[in-house]
């Protein structure tokens, strides 16, 4: 009701100026309240997503990263992949924009009120380990399962012990064909055995991730290195 009161005089003037009926005026007045609540809900969904920064696709320099198909990336903003429970994997070396793109898609999903959560792979593993030690692993797995879109950043930057790999597999298996997951990694798929220290687990994880997945292989240069070079020139 607060927004309706704030805009009351404005709407009354609009009704008079445009010779509107009482019902038409009430609809316009109510729309202010609805829009305000919707905006608050969107801000809340984005905040819950725990994104590392607020970067959207329009902030991404597709000209610098020419190995990326811009149309394919922008198609992810339609969120059709979410409805199909498909995954996205951004593969490339450090600094090429993997996290930016993953975050942008996540923000787009949150703005459409899809439950979304961003977490670094190492932090995810630590949470699952802690939950297992405290005999609440099932609850923690259900927590991460509930998100329509889960973004796991920096898979492969740190090695994952065999027992931890089993925990990671349980989550991926739980979400398989039911929820969408976005992963960013700097490790080629044929080297995942080295990350998980177990080829059987590595293959099982890969099988479930890649079965319904869009793989974006980014082969360009580092944005961070470019920014450093620009600053150095200045």
Region spans (language model):
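Loop/turn-to-beta-strand initiation segments
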Residues: 86, 113-115, 146-149, 177-183
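Hydrophobic positions on the alpha1 helix immediately C-terminal to the Walker A/P-loop
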Residues: 101, 105
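Post-Walker A helix-loop "phosphate-sensing" segment adjacent to the P-loop in P-loop NTPases
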Residues: 106-119
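N-terminal pre-Walker A segment at the start of P-loop NTPase domains
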Residues: 55-79
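Pre-Walker A (Motif I) flank of P-loop NTPase domains
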Residues: 83-89
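Interdomain "pre-motor" coupling segment immediately N-terminal to P-loop NTPase/helicase cores
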Residues: 2-53
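Conserved lysine of the Walker
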Residues: 98
